[in-house]
A protein has these predicted regions:
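N-terminal lobe of the biotin/lipoate ligase/transferase fold
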Residues: 1-102
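Catalytic beta-strand/loop module used to bind and position nucleotide/cofactor moieties
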Residues: 87-134
Length: 134
């Protein structure tokens, strides 16, 4: 792109496998140049539990129960807490250069998309959560 212009791309994963989606997310992070490129990855998963980089799965999840129910357990490379995913959960990853990262801007993109696409009114609170109903 010309000097100062930012290319924007959206990747929508066709996979619902947590390991494939985390691998794709990690590959993009490690191999793409975000100096003049903003990327959004959209993905969903079959039922799974995802733990943060430094978390102990035995403290964060009922591992025997996950095995009984055939629910995948995965570790992501980023920090953060343990979360449950299923096909009703939409995951969005924003990739941008560190100097251009703006959480509020990313949240506003999601807020606008909810309204434009579905007529859903939402707000962003002081904790930077998107609330549909508070």
């Amino acid at each position: 792109p010309p000097e100062g212009e930012i290319t924007k791309s959206v990747f929508m994963s066709q996979s619902t496998d947590i390991y494939t989606n985390l691998a794709m997310e990690d590959w993009m992070y490690r191999n793409m140049d975000f100096s003049d490129h903003h990327v959004m990855m959209v993905w969903r998963n079959e039922p799974c539990v995802v733990i943060g980089r430094h978390q102990n799965p035995w403290l964060e999840a009922n591992v025997p129960f996950l095995g009984e129910k055939e629910i995948s357990l995965a570790r992501r490379n980023s920090g953060g807490g343990t979360v449950y995913h299923d096909r009703g959960n939409l995951n969005i990853t924003f990739f941008t250069h560190r100097d251009r990262y703006d959480r509020k801007y990313n949240l506003e993109l999601i807020k606008r998309a909810l309204y434009r696409g579905f007529g859903i009114k939402s707000l962003i609170n002081e904790r930077q959560d998107i609330l549909v109903r508070d």
